[in-house]
C-alpha cells in the first residue's frame, strides 16, 4: 500500500489551487487582500509569508549579507537561504516576477 495520491485526488488538488488563484485575482484593494488572507491563513502563516517577502526584497537589494538579512527580517538563516535559492534558481520565478513588476511600478 502506498501513500501516492490517486489521479482523481491530484485533479481535485489542482482544481482547488486554480480556484484559489481565481479568488486572489478577484481582489481589488489592499483591504480586500487583507480581509481574505486574514480569513484564509492563521496569524503565523501570514507572518511567515510576510517574513519571506521581506527576505526576498532585501536579497534583491544585494546590499547585505545573508546573516544581516536574517537579522533585519527576523528570519532564520535557513529561510534566507531558501528564499535566495527560489529567487535565483527555481523555474517558477514568482519572487522575481513580482519584484521586477513592483520596481517598474515605483
Regions flagged by a language model, labelled:
Residues 33-52:
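Short, Lys/Arg-enriched anionic-surface-contact patches
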Residues 32, 44-45, 60-63, 88:
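Short alpha-helix boundary/capping elements
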Residues 84-87, 91:
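DNA major-groove recognition helix of helix-turn-helix
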Residues 79-80:
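Helix-turn-helix DNA-binding helix
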Residues 49-64:
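Short, amphipathic alpha-helical "recognition" segments used to contact nucleic acids or chromatin
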Amino acid at each position: 500500500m502506498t501513500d501516492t495520491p490517486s489521479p482523481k485526488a491530484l485533479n481535485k488538488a489542482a482544481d482547488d489551487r486554480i480556484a484559489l488563484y481565481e479568488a486572489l485575482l478577484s481582489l481589488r484593494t489592499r483591504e480586500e487582500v487583507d480581509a481574505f488572507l486574514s480569513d484564509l491563513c492563521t496569524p503565523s502563516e501570514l507572518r511567515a509569508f510576510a517574513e519571506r517577502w521581506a527576505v526576498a526584497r532585501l536579497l534583491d537589494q544585494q546590499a547585505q549579507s545573508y546573516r544581516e538579512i536574517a537579522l533585519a527580517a527576523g528570519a532564520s538563516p535557513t529561510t534566507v537561504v531558501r528564499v535566495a535559492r527560489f529567487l535565483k534558481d527555481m523555474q517558477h520565478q514568482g519572487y522575481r516576477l513580482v519584484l521586477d513588476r513592483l520596481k517598474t511600478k515605483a
